[in-house]
Amino acid sequence: MNATWDIFCSVVDNYGDIGVTWRLARQLVAEHGLAVRLWVDDLNAFTPMCPGADAGAAQQWQQGVDVRHWPAAWQPVAPADVVIGAFACQLPAAYVEAMRARATPPLWLNLEYLSAEDWVEGCHGLPSPQPNGLRKVFFFPGFTEKTGGLLREGSLLARRDAFQQSAEARQAFLQGLGVEPEQGALLVSLFAYENPQLASWLDALATGAQPCHLLVPQGRIVAGLSQWLGEAPLPVGSVRKRRALTVQVLPFVSQDDFDRLLWSCDFNAVRGEDSFVRAQWAGQPMLWHIYVQDENAHWEKLDAFLAHYRRGLSDEADAALLGLWRAWNMDFDMGQAWQAARQHWPELQQHARLWAVRQAAQPDLATALVHFYRNSL
């Protein structure tokens, strides 16, 4: 009999937390044949990425996953064999007590935020005995073989390659979104938090020698985009042109369509964790807007990733990439940084592709979790 899995997700940062846990739950069901319940405290954050989902349902089945609303007033349920608390969320006290009362305690995993910092390898898989006698294990996603790896479906890169090698597939997908870039335009996606350097980047795109079509899924960055255009907040479907730059606001799409959007673009600016990982799998030059933390703690996290990602670049391309990422995240001139990066475009393209290949050589996160459970028996 297959093990049962419970994944708890408390929505903190809009779509990032639910994005990761929904992908994980889907993969555990589809590729490992597991029975998975996904507990979400805010289903309004879930429905945009899962068309057909009901934000008011206490229970619903979506793509083989038993999706449950995590109510403030917890109703008793039997705990699963494997319990994952995503991103240090606090499980219901009554559920934890039911875990303790089981004849065989479940495997309790704390799925941590993704980080490339050196200390992650030493903490991955460490147990944390609890006062009630249970044991919680810290499970860290990451970029090295001494971590839990990244979320990656088994067929992901093959599907990406087939899509990117088919001009017809790309054109059909973009037309379905109402996107019709002019011939030879650089296609760029932008999914980010508010950023004071947005205007300087847009200025550079608008005055560039190559036409640019900027695709912006609805979200927090749209207000800044509208301000740069001198307009009221742009509704979904809006298309505006300023010199060489065409700006288009897209609707929120499913996770699978978001992957296709990233695959379609020549450059992807992303944020948070879920879209950050998916942009890496897209194999295109990218830019990450990291989530801001107190006392600029996020800068260490940013530089830790860049220390891995930049390996193999020429000194000139390395400096340009570093300058671009720091400009976007540390409030330096994005216009100059963008122009510098464009001078090394072929190398950055090849490097992004090789990075995806190297990361795909490691076990994916879902498989690592399943193996960890089996080894614990």
Regions found by a protein language model. Give the residues of each.
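Extreme N-terminal starter segment of soluble prokaryotic enzymes
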Residues: N2-D6
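Short, glycine-rich nucleotide/cofactor-binding loops
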Residues: I7-I18, F191-P196, F267
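A short helix->loop->beta-strand "cap" motif at the edges of active sites that frequently abuts
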Residues: A103-L107, Q210, Q284
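C-terminal amphipathic helix plus adjacent low-complexity
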Residues: E153-S155, R311-L377
